[in-house]
Amino acid sequence: MPKVAVIMGSKNDWEYMREAVEILKQFGIDYEARVVSAHRTPEFMMQYAKEAEKRGIEVIIAGAGGAAHLPGMVASLTSLPVIGVPIPSKNLNGLDSLLSIVQMPYGVPVATVAIGGAKNAALLAIRILGIKYKELADKIKKFSEDMRNDVLSTRLEA
């Protein structure tokens, strides 16, 4: 049963959102990935968000570009944690998406990562799951330690 839902506003967003899926796979986390458009399939989006918890989903990663309403709309329909990933856009390089996702009204929180930051969205989802699942907490700690050790062992030659 998937623990993480990776959703996006269009299939074009998959270019960025697949990076979240790769991280989830690396950590052995069951997930589902699909297009859920806030504008083209609003009824489906509402049903999807409302039923996610019943289906065993524990964290939702939602990527969207442009107006980027998907993360906020999903967050308004569920009590699950929602992580928004602003997708780079043609006109404003994703700044429009970032501002849309990060400026949520009181009571509808969306954790927001950097523009195109699907990898960090997955890592944040793993940290959230690590509160409940000790094995994931241990894996994310090891991941962070390995990154730290890689940096500390780096030697530069002139």
UniProtKB/Swiss-Prot annotation:
Q: In the UniProt record, does the keyword Isomerase occur?
A: yes
Which E.C. number(s) belong to this protein? 5.4.99.18
Q: Pathway of this protein?
A: Purine metabolism; IMP biosynthesis via de novo pathway; 5-amino-1-(5-phospho-D-ribosyl)imidazole-4-carboxylate from 5-amino-1-(5-phospho-D-ribosyl)imidazole (N5-CAIR route): step 2/2
Give residues annotated as binding substrate: S10, D13, R40
Q: Which reaction does it catalyse?
A: 5-carboxyamino-1-(5-phospho-D-ribosyl)imidazole + H(+) = 5-amino-1-(5-phospho-D-ribosyl)imidazole-4-carboxylate
The cross-references to Gene3D superfamilies, in alphabetical order and at most eight, read:
3.40.50.1970
Enzyme class, one word?
isomerase
- Set out the biological process GO terms recorded for this chain's protein: 'de novo' IMP biosynthetic process
Top-rank taxon, per record: Archaea
Q: Which UniProt keywords apply?
A: Isomerase, Purine biosynthesis
Q: Which GO terms describe its molecular function?
A: 5-(carboxyamino)imidazole ribonucleotide mutase activity
Instruction: Give the similarity note.
Output: Belongs to the AIR carboxylase family. Class I subfamily.
- Any idea what job this protein has? Catalyzes the conversion of N5-carboxyaminoimidazole ribonucleotide (N5-CAIR) to 4-carboxy-5-aminoimidazole ribonucleotide (CAIR).
Name of the protein in its database record: N5-carboxyaminoimidazole ribonucleotide mutase
Upper classification of the source organism reads: Archaea, Thermoproteota, Thermoprotei, Sulfolobales, Sulfolobaceae
Q: Which gene encodes it?
A: purE
